[in-house]
Amino acid sequence: MTLYLVRHGETAFNRDGQGLGRKDVPLTERGLAQAEAVAGRFATVKVTRVLSSPLARALTLAGLVAARHQLQPEVMESLTELDIGETDGMSFAEMRGRFPDFLKTWASDDGWRARMP
């Protein structure tokens, strides 16, 4: 068995430097083109299942890949993005101003200890 992990394409939050967690933000036009390109790369790969987060940005990509193989994506809640609390949708500049200690910990070797505000 081979498992491929694929990240969704660009969203407005990614493009604009905003934190993105569980907000259901769709792909931009560029992100959709990226998703279509990924689906094209999987056209010749044997795919028997496509699993996805329920968020639109991931489900769009999963749907494109699955369609190439006459499959339907299977939604798994456990694949939902990390809940980033108050920082969801916030610019990194705003995060630095409001939560400097959090960002310092998050960027450190002990980043796994960081608690989302």
Describe every region a protein language model picked out:
Residues 69-117:
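Phosphate-handling substructures
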Residues 3-6, 10-71, 75:
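Active-site-proximal alpha-helix that buttresses catalytic centers in soluble enzyme cores
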